[in-house]
């Protein structure tokens, strides 16, 4: 089967986007050919480059595209338009995506000459049998809607209109805990989902959500594609220090000396909801500075490393400077980063996929909350004895409880690590069964 793969997010820094996009690509390409890839840069919230105005005729886009310095001028126009709209840029006259998907497709086709980077969206160019969407966390039904959700839904609608098969895999379906349930978006997407070959979600919460909110869909449940990396994480390759593996932004002089992974260590990251909950970056930095200092004090015999797993965790670079804590950079090669997490004694985080990477090596996690049910659902998936989430901005009392739980999990030692690792092996076998979906 010839496949167009939507949501290949390896172009992002985010550990989870890079890892699970690759894992799902490996699963679907085992017996199929991927003939087109639509990357996350242009389905996501902001391209920084889009030139579109609802009332421009097609000839305008063709004309400006011939201008020698168009790509530079376009960025300036984009910023000017954003300033004019002042927070109301998306789903406005300056965005091709709309709740009417036929209109969105026509808008896209019309503006392509002036936006050549969007060419990958044009499904007319591919000789393909099926469109596969890497659902990940794109379909959170927030108010206002996530742009990524509508763009990917538009592509599903278009593929179905062309008579192609559509597979929605590796998905999470959820409300946004920080905004209203978006019934309008659900009603729009339901007929698209109902025509798909399969709607496959990665955990029980999403399965229940789909049952409650979508009708007449072919619903299946497989663990996240990232669990298929069990063998990679548990092979013979060891990461003992950072000097051979650090990415460009982390390749400082100190990276040759400050990272010793041969001694017991603890890793700390942020949460996907920290930017929503906090009033300012300063507040985030202050809270995480206190958390890191408390962990360093409580675990004096352990190395402590910060892990910048996502663009939203960039504040950890400030925390690293204040607390003099080494930080593993966001552009660290993904398998090396995974090995580091997988061999920590404990991982404190509100991140979904990085927690899976850690768990594949048996590392127990202490979870903070996230932008959905995902940090709760992954604990259930891993069969944790107690499902526990801490506040994304933990106060002194919660920091003490985080440390207490971290100590307990470390003291459980090999027994707990082996239990987590064995569960991940089971989930690895389960997620690989997605290869059979294309044979049905």
What are these regions (language model features)?
Residues 1-440:
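Active-site anion-handling motifs in enzyme catalytic cores
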């Amino acid at each position: 089967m010839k496949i167009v793969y939507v949501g290949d997010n390896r172009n992002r820094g985010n550990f989870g986007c890079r890892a699970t996009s690759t894992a799902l690509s490996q699963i679907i390409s085992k017996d199929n050919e991927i003939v087109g890839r639509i990357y996350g840069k242009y389905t996501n919230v902001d391209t920084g480059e889009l030139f579109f105005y609802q009332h421009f005729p097609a000839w305008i886009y063709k004309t400006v595209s011939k201008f020698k310095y168009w790509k530079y001028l376009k960025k300036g126009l984009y910023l000017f338009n954003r300033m004019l709209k002042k927070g109301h840029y998306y789903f406005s006259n300056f965005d091709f995506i709309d709740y009417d998907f036929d209109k969105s497709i026509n808008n896209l086709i019309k503006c392509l000459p002036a936006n050549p980077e969007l060419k990958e969206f044009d499904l007319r160019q591919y000789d393909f049998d099926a469109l596969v969407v890497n659902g990940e966390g794109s379909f959170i039904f927030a108010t206002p809607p996530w742009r990524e959700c509508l763009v990917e839904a538009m592509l599903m609608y278009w593929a179905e209109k062309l008579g192609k098969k559509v597979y929605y895999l590796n998905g999470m379906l959820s409300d946004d805990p920080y905004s209203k349930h978006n019934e309008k978006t659900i009603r729009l997407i339901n007929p698209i989902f109902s025509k798909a070959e399969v709607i496959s979600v990665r955990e029980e919460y999403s399965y229940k959500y789909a049952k409650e909110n979508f009708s007449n869909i072919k619903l299946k449940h497989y663990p996240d594609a990232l669990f298929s990396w069990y063998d990679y994480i548990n092979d013979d390759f060891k990461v003992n220090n950072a000097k051979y593996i650090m990415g460009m932004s982390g390749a400082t002089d100190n990276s040759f000396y400050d990272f010793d992974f041969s001694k017991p260590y603890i890793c700390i990251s942020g949460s996907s909801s920290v930017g929503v909950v906090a009033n300012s970056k300063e507040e985030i930095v202050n809270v995480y500075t206190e958390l890191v200092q408390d962990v360093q004090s409580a675990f004096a015999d352990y190395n402590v490393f910060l892990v910048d797993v996502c663009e939203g965790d960039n504040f950890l670079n400030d925390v690293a400077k204040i607390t003099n804590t080494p930080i593993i950079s966001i552009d660290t090669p993904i398998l090396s980063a995974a090995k580091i997490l997988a061999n920590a004694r404990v991982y404190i985080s509100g991140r979904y996929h990085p927690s899976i990477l850690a768990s594949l090596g048996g590392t127990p996690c202490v979870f903070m909350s996230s932008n959905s049910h995902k940090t709760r659902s992954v604990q259930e998936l891993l069969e944790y004895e107690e499902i526990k989430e801490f506040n994304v901005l933990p106060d002194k009392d919660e920091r003490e409880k985080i440390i207490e739980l971290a100590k307990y999990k470390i003291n459980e030692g090999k027994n707990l690590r082996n239990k987590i690792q064995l569960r991940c092996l089971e989930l690895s076998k389960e997620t690989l069964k997605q290869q059979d979906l294309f044979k049905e």
